[in-house]
Amino acid sequence: MFLLQRFFIYGLFLACFYTTVFGEKHFEAEEYRDSFLSQENMNKINHTTIERLFREMTENDPSLLSSSKTLAELSKGELAKAREDLKSVLSFLKNNLPVDTESSSEAFTIEKDNNSCVWLNSVKSFVEKQFSYSSGTNGILATFLTAIPPNIFILLVPKSFDTSMLNLFVAVSAGSLLGDVFLQLLPTVYSTNGGDFPASSVYSILIGALVFFLMDKGIRILIHERPSSLSKPKKDGEETSSVNKPSASSTQTDVKGVEGLRKRNVKDDQNSKGHEPDLIRHVVEEVSEEYNDKTVVYLNLLCDSFHNFMDGLAITSAFFTNTSIGISTTFAVLLHEIPAEIGDLAILLRNGYTKSQVLVLQMITMVTGLLGAIVATYIYTASSSSSPYGSFLLQLEDKLLPFTAGGFLYIAYLGVFPELLEINLSKGKLGNMIYTALYMMFIVGGFSFLYYV
């Protein structure tokens, strides 16, 4: 295997060598060679870049690999140039090949930078071997795996969990989502369209963001839409959840309304002869609390189900594009799901649910994620048929990746970053500044992680 890999690489560089023979006729291929042999780019060589360069060169001019010009027909200048090229290549390979006598026939790792971690490439290679099945099977398997760590994490998180520590996970989630969009999804859309970004892909990104916006807005409307007679004024010191947190203007209006209700209630109590108003008000408050709690729980479950469906769709679509992109999308979804599941845990525990009940509800939402993976598999499989329906699915298939990118952008900028903008008054100014610096570090860390995946 090792000899075959070397033969492939030497053949590639011999193809680069032939670009000097044909002069201006193969000027573009010569640019590939010069770019490839520059020290800055040589430090970024891996199997993917080698295969890409090989494909570009052969597509540029297939005759590069089948030239009839022999070594005797080359001029002294051409031979000198070839020697320098091969000398540079061999020197680079000698300095970067791993020294391992037992597994040298299977290991071929070239560092991206001088101080690059070889173990990271080994981990990536190991993960890719786990997804050696068909694209559809890989997508369903990855979707299932993304649901396991968050549920395990739920069991380990104590009920009194510091929200500032939770926001560190949220920051990693934000960085990973942006990394998946800008380092994986959008470059793939660009490359699959021949170095172009068609208007249909741009609108698909917009549609993806709008779908998540409509879902988010609809849930907010449904949560706050209840009979005004059932509205319950908050007690002093009672905290408001992030889901039902009103804006500043609405808070002022609510305060005035509550004061008016209090004055009216005092007047009613003075004029009444019995305790009937107190009893009625107590019943109304209990009904209001039960109605609001059930609404929050059910709508949160609905939101999670749709979100997991879109995650399954995105992961499987990425695997049908490329295994490496599928793995990076899986990591992005996984890093986002952990803080999201903790947030769901907080909502459900606050409404009286036990951890075991929370896990049952999360299993229900996991099924919707698997359903999304199955739908994506069906779309990509059926699109290969020559029927009009298959043609429609083929067009839909091309829009799934940019649609996913738009959804991830909405989640990152309007779903995740606003949580990081919240100020924790108990930490003080210095504490909030320190946590802000930590958020920046974790965002960059999450983004950089997707660069190496």
From Swiss-Prot:
Residue ranges, Lumenal side: 24-137, 187-194, 380-399
GO CC annotation: endoplasmic reticulum; endoplasmic reticulum membrane
Subcellular location: Endoplasmic reticulum membrane
GO molecular function: zinc ion transmembrane transporter activity
Membrane topology note: Multi-pass membrane protein
Keywords per UniProt: Endoplasmic reticulum, Membrane, Signal, Transmembrane, Transmembrane helix
Basic and acidic residues compositional bias, start-end: 229-238, 256-278
N-terminal signal peptide: 1-23
Start-end of Polar residues biased regions: 240-254
Ranges facing Cytoplasmic side: 159-165, 216-358, 421-432
UniProt superkingdom: Eukaryota
Region (Disordered): 229-278
InterPro entries cross-referenced by the UniProt entry: MFS_trans_sf, ZIP
Record flagged with keyword Transmembrane: yes
Transmembrane domains' residue ranges: 138-158, 166-186, 195-215, 359-379, 400-420, 433-453
GO terms under biological process: intracellular zinc ion homeostasis; zinc ion transmembrane transport
PANTHER family registered for this protein in UniProt: ZINC TRANSPORTER SLC39A7 HISTIDINE-RICH MEMBRANE PROTEIN KE4, ZINC TRANSPORTER ZIP13
Family (UniProt): Belongs to the ZIP transporter (TC 2.A.5) family. KE4/Catsup subfamily.
Name used for this protein in its record: Uncharacterized zinc transporter P8A3.03
Provenance organism: Schizosaccharomyces pombe (strain 972 / ATCC 24843) (Fission yeast)
Upper taxonomic lineage: Eukaryota, Fungi, Dikarya, Ascomycota, Taphrinomycotina
